[in-house]
Amino acid sequence: MYRHACYLYIISQGGELLSVAIIKEWPSVFITSLAASTMKRRHCKLNSLPQELFDKIVEYLSLSDYCNLVLVCKRPSSKYNVIFDSTNHQHLKGVYKKTDVQITSYNEYINCICNELRQDEFYAKSSWIASICGHQRATIFSVTNKQVEMKYHLYNIAIVESEDCNGFYPFEPTRDCLICKQKNQCPRNSFIVSLCKYLEKQNVQSNFIYYLYEINT
């Protein structure tokens, strides 16, 4: 979701978007002053932008800058009011409710028929059973806080590594949530996306803490 150190300069008139510039060099605190100065202008107020455009702006902000924006505009994004992050942010506590989420993980082969192949006389003595099987090694994640798991549909999450070992993706990327029948709108999806990015950065322990940020609405 969030692209760190990227900021938007927006020019609009009469509700029509005229120009958007993505600027990387400005310090994080600039987004607060930009929001404050923009709100003072008669015809260009961030808190009066169409919701779709406001949500689009939030996509380019880090969690810290998003919280600054909420603090200034008194307006959260309808799309990103539930955020999962591996970083323990300890500032702007009035903007969000933070919950520590204990996560356990283990590895498992998916779509594996190695045992069946070993029972076949033709393959039993083969040293290439794993290659013939073509199974995938997945990391299965479980949330120990059952209240959080049920509220945000964080059940049975399996993530696999890409064949070129350059990234991770959900084992069933096109599957809708079985509870709410949604995909992109379900917090489960943002949790999976965040976990994939987390896996790319470091080796995951069997037990670790993640953080749930519920933005005040």
UniProtKB/Swiss-Prot annotation:
PROSITE patterns assigned = FBOX
Question: Between which residues do disulfide bridges form?
Answer: none
Q: Where is the F-box domain?
A: 43-92
Which domain of life does this protein belong to? Viruses
Xref: Pfam families = F-box-like
Database matches in SUPFAM superfamilies = F-box domain
Put simply, this protein is called: Uncharacterized 14.2 kDa protein in PK1-LEF1 intergenic region
User: Which organism is this protein's natural source?
Assistant: Autographa californica nuclear polyhedrosis virus (AcMNPV)
Organism lineage string = Viruses, Viruses incertae sedis, Naldaviricetes, Lefavirales, Baculoviridae
